[in-house]
């Protein structure tokens, strides 16, 4: 009897305490508790964070995919009909291309409004779409934002993907986080004027007629991801910016103001340029543009750059003098480990005098080498060169996706040599999922690095 009481101690707690415990679980795990007992079955409906994600309930590869979607929508309606509480914190619907479910979706959104929701996520983008606006038509969007949303004063965070709305109607003065996806925006600045307290803005896969933020902008975080910008120009006045992330084609950025003290993180990804039939700019032009961009954002404490930037940054006119010192303490290089990137890597290292952590994020797996091909690291990394950060500040080297290709090995071997990495203390190697032979090759590479510099600790993390 004592053991039974011990096992059921949690169930003996008051409902209000159980609801607090459930609030620390994901919504999906919350739902699972309903099978524990009749009491738990009712308590789970008191969760203040409600999330319905099609991907967690419907497998798009099954033959009865359509009927599964119908069941999923019925499940959502049945759930909200049982919610007894009058106020919820967050409400999320992720249902791709909801043709035929317009009435049901409207009912679900109105439920969240009636519960004075603070965080609302409406994602109707299809998993079959590309991650860009290109090729989409107006009839791809079937859900229109209900009128009551525009004036909902409890709303603090709003995400709307592939949903029709009128930017001029918003009066949510308390909104602090806004994320818009798969939409055409004519003027971002006029939209932001509706939200005087906005701190975080994300624009995903949108068509942007004009990107101009020149007024009094409070935004601390700005994310622009895979958007079409026909002007190829972006004017930004961001005196409070702390986080800036951009993914897409190379465009000209004109930063009117950036607070050097506040800027914490910058992420720059132009990898899409590798996939374009014709590059947006020549390597020299792209190198000039991206050098100016790095100079404008040089005060960031964490800097992440892509393989394309590494390739073209050295193509600009007089790259050594054009690029100013970057104040980053953590540099993340998303790389294919191609020799074309190495000059750009060295250039950035030469201009990061305060660097403490260097991370290589490998973008694709390197197969086990079927024939040995010696790559002379002294050809790729000039002899007797040691950057200021290698001599003074760089303590941690991280490689994610380590496979020990020859390009990886000779680069890392150069960095851990005692005569180069004076301050280096630790190397962390993270393996991706590998078959037995490639995994053994990676183990061998880690052991060789450890032998190269006994004073540096080499740590290998298996997948």
Curated annotation (Swiss-Prot):
Q: Which organism is it from?
A: Arabidopsis thaliana (Mouse-ear cress)
By its UniProt entry, which SUPFAM superfamilies does this protein fall under?
F-box domain, L domain-like
Limits of the F-box domain: 7-55
Q: What is this protein called?
A: Putative F-box protein At3g29830
Pfam family of the protein (one): F-box
Q: Where are the transmembrane segments?
A: none
